[in-house]
Curated annotation (Swiss-Prot):
Belongs to the alpha-ketoglutarate/Fe-dependent halogenase family. Keywords: Amino-acid biosynthesis, Antibiotic biosynthesis, Iron, Oxidoreductase, Plasmid. Disruption phenotype: Cells lacking this gene no longer produce detectable amounts of L-propargylglycine and L-beta-ethynylserine, that are terminal alkyne-containing amino acids produced by wild-type S.cattleya. It comes from the Bacteria. GO terms for molecular function: L-lysine 4-chlorinase activity. Its EC number is 1.14.20.-. Pfam families: HalD. Pathway: Amino-acid metabolism; Antibiotic biosynthesis. One of its GO terms (biological process) is L-beta-ethynylserine biosynthetic process. Involved in the biosynthesis of terminal alkyne-containing amino acids such as L-propargylglycine (Pra) and L-beta-ethynylserine, that are produced as antibiotics by S.cattleya. Catalyzes the chlorination of L-lysine at the C4 position, leading to the production of 4-chloro-L-lysine. It catalyses: L-lysine + chloride + 2-oxoglutarate + O2 + H(+) = 4-chloro-L-lysine + succinate + CO2 + H2O. This is L-lysine 4-chlorinase. It is an enzyme of class 1 (oxidoreductase).
Length: 242
């Protein structure tokens, strides 16, 4: 499933992760495993995809336009994804990179998410994650000139009552990343403001997100009604009509 990494590789990845909030770990995952995950995501999208088009109050009304397969649907219908999520062969190197233990996500609706951006303008707008760590499998990526690139501002914090996203964008550099189909990256989601650049034309960008918690997350109280991927009718969401 996973290819072993040398100590020097782990050290290099860990240093980059703590500096930039993100590292590419494609070399950690065997190509055969990545192909299996791609086929599994396609199957789940074909059977269970739900469309979302909304703006979210807790991130200054940034946009969410994509199709999704929610976490609990994935958990109930994919032994492959749930098995990978709990596999020590995957968790051990990620924990070495993070420098701490990765705990199963304490909220079942946030363990997993499959998204498919497919229409011109589709985007996952500026946001943070409620929990500390995510492994993102880029299963299908558009060409670099079409959009869908990842942008990040590390070492930021999320105040849901006053996100101040534009202030962060003005006061900090924005790092931009292009990934090819099959790439995998590890992201510090709670302190890295991030988004995907909107698609310039109809095309396809598919990812699988696996989320883990840090020790600090286990006692957190999440009061905001903003879990849009699980329910498009949450109170923090404003539907996009156009």
């Amino acid at each position: 499933m996973c290819a072993p990494l040398e100590k020097d590789d782990i050290r290099r990845l860990s240093q980059a992760f703590h500096r930039f909030g993100i590292v590419t770990v494609t070399e950690l995952i065997e190509p055969h495993t990545r192909k299996l995950v791609r086929a599994e995501a396609d199957r789940l999208l074909d059977q269970y995809a739900e469309r979302r088009d909304l703006r979210l109050a807790t991130t200054d009304y940034t946009r969410r336009s994509m199709s999704v397969v929610p976490s609990e649907t994935i958990a109930a219908n994919s032994e492959l994804v749930t098995g990978l999520y709990a596999h020590r062969e995957l968790l051990a190197p990620l924990e070495a990179i993070a420098g701490e233990r990765l705990h199963p996500c304490p909220k079942a609706d946030e363990e997993f998410l499959i998204t498919r951006q497919e229409q011109r303008g589709d985007t996952h707008g500026w946001h943070w994650g409620d929990f500390s760590f995510a492994l993102i499998w880029v299963l299908q990526a558009p060409p670099i000139d079409v959009g869908g690139l990842l942008q990040c501002v590390p070492h930021t914090t999320w105040d849901k009552a006053s996100p101040q996203i534009n202030r962060y964008l003005v006061e900090n550099p924005i790092d931009t990343y292009h990934f090819e189909s099959g790439d995998v990256y590890f992201l510090r989601t709670d302190t890295t403001l991030h988004r995907t650049i909107p698609l310039r034309e109809d095309t396809t960008r598919i990812i699988l997100n696996m989320t883990w918690a840090g020790e600090r997350d286990l006692s957190r109280k999440l009061a905001a009604d903003d879990r849009w991927w699980d329910n498009a009718e949450v109170s923090a969401a404003r539907a996009i009509k156009d």
